[in-house]
Amino acid sequence: MDKKFIRNFSIIAHIDHGKSTLSDRIIEFTNTLSKREMTNQILDSMDIERERGITIKLNAVQIKYHARDNNEYLIHLIDTPGHVDFTYEVSRSLAACEGAILVVDAAQGIEAQTLSNVYLALENNLEIVPTINKIDLPSADPERVKKEIEDVIGLDTSDIPLISAKTGLNIQDVLEAIIKHVPPPLDANDDAKLQALIFDSFYDSYKGVVCLVRIKQGTIKVGDKIRMMANNKDYIVSELGIRTPKIVNKTELVAGEVGWVAAAIKTVKDINVGDTITHANNPADKPLPGYKKILPMVYCGLYPIDTSQYDDLKEAMAKISLSDAALTYEYETSQALGFGIRCGFLGLLHMDVIRERIAREFNIELILTAPSVIYKIELTNNQEISIDSPAKMPEPTNIKAIKEPFVKLAIITPDNYVGAIMELCQSRRGSYQDLEVIDGTRRRLIYKMPLAEIMYSFFDSLKSITKGYATMDYELIGYQAEKLVKIDIMLNGNKVDALSIIAHRDFAYGKSKIICERLKEVIPKHQFEIPIQASIGSKIIARETIKAVRKDVIAKCYGGDVSRKKKLLEQQKEGKKRLKAIGNVDVPQDAFVKVLSEN
């Protein structure tokens, strides 16, 4: 096929602006799938994606479209996630394209992640085609949104498609805009040395790891000996093809095409997303510009509530990590919770999705320890180490400084909530950077804030004070030294490692008090008094006491000498003292679940 009839594009948007629904309508309009084969969110392959109405894994399909100019075009569509946690998925798909459709909600207008995705597209030199969706809503105001797109992003909206992905209104206008504005891959040459960009991978129990690729140059065929340029590993191509979104086998993929390649690769860890595939016997001179290695932002310990399921949890993590390149994990033990796994996630939604997949696909209920970020510790001997858990914190005497990650936080909000949001950000150690006007009623607030503060229910608080109208987006900007301390929680004088946290010194007392109070509520009474203490080093900063259960030892004394009663009470007192010295505090699992889930 002549390269001028090929188009490669992504759909980008803020979460819930209708990307996946638009993908459905395009697939339906072009008869890529029959009516019987169509389901809602056809490109969202996981049940969790369909139930939550979000896209987590990106997906790619090949579509044939007979345009108004009477030519048939080969269009490769890549659907992308919209949530901030999965920005890395968006950046991967954009590198495989020449253009992007920017979907904007006709009622909501431009939101936080609309802008961050636009910047990603511009970084990849993509042609952006704006599209206004949901024009069938009673609250839709396409003219206002057009003005926003022109003023805030600077895109021309004179011939912008106005569509309803839900009803299928004006879907052909989107396809025509793609043909008109997205450039074809004219520099692609079938006879050049092979350069194929891996923009995603997934695990298939029969094929092994399947790579989703964009063939930039050259041709790849079944039986070819290929090489991964990042690690110089060689494989033989066993199968390849395209997705429609059904898996369709082919004998070759040529320059300009988007498809999949299987080569008996054992695990996803053998594949670097962003790597370049070339021929082993005639390799390309240099790899394509790849991606940055994905680094987890949030760490958390996962422990099975039923400790006998630890081996099942190990197996579950191994299987899930086969198809999730961003998930990292290592085994750990806790004196309080037993054997578990410490995992690195892209963000809290990613963490929640993994927890739900383990519960649903493997029937394992989990306790999650308090999420933590990566701290950089400067030691007194001038070494620098990174820790992802309070348990790994060195002794205070060995620490020169503790640095924590900071983010640039952008919040788009109706102007009547600006004051409340500024108060929230300041209470979370945020420092004000900028305030931009988007239109007559909406503002964009920029704050610099510690990542750790965003993790603890910040998004819930933001939604609560703005009645759900504010949207946010953040990006990591670096590390900064802060007055941070490790808070240990002790029960009856013994440290409980699972409850340790790292906090700012100014907020340490408040957080400690809350944890101690919650523990007092959930730990049952024992026959001896239990002190619950929070400490920084050897200094106790908060305390609660669980009173002892009193057994009435003098109930059997009817009258008689008072010294008899005193003797029995004295014996009880001695017994309790002995019990307190040697007795272990029995903390039920649900107490940990309650304290950690609310922490």
Curated annotation (Swiss-Prot):
Keyword Thylakoid: no
PROSITE patterns reported for this sequence: G_TR_1 (PS00301), G_TR_2 (PS51722)
One function term, GO molecular function aspect: ribosome binding
Binding annotation for GTP: D16, H17, G18, K19, S20, T21, N133, K134, I135, D136
Protein's GO biological process: positive regulation of translation
Record flagged with keyword rRNA-binding: no
Coiled coil: none
InterPro entries: EF-4 (IPR006297), EFG_III/V (IPR035647), EFG_V-like (IPR000640), EFTu-like_2 (IPR004161), G_TR_CS (IPR031157), LepA_C_sf (IPR038363), LepA_CTD (IPR013842), LepA_IV (IPR035654)
EC main group: hydrolase
Alphabetical list of SUPFAM superfamilies matching this protein: EF-G C-terminal domain-like, P-loop containing nucleoside triphosphate hydrolases, Translation proteins
Membrane topology value: Peripheral membrane protein
Record keywords: Cell membrane, GTP-binding, Hydrolase, Membrane, Nucleotide-binding, Protein biosynthesis
EC number: 3.6.5.n1
GO cellular component entries: plasma membrane
Domain tr-type G: 4-186
Catalytic activity: GTP + H2O = GDP + phosphate + H(+)
Compartments where located: Cell membrane
Function noted in UniProt: Required for accurate and efficient protein synthesis under certain stress conditions. May act as a fidelity factor of the translation reaction, by catalyzing a one-codon backward translocation of tRNAs on improperly translocated ribosomes. Back-translocation proceeds from a post-translocation (POST) complex to a pre-translocation (PRE) complex, thus giving elongation factor G a second chance to translocate the tRNAs correctly. Binds to ribosomes in a GTP-dependent manner.
Family the entry assigns: Belongs to the TRAFAC class translation factor GTPase superfamily. Classic translation factor GTPase family. LepA subfamily.
NCBIfam families hit by this protein: lepA (TIGR01393), small_GTP (TIGR00231)
Name of this protein: Elongation factor 4
Organism annotation: Ureaplasma urealyticum serovar 10 (strain ATCC 33699 / Western)
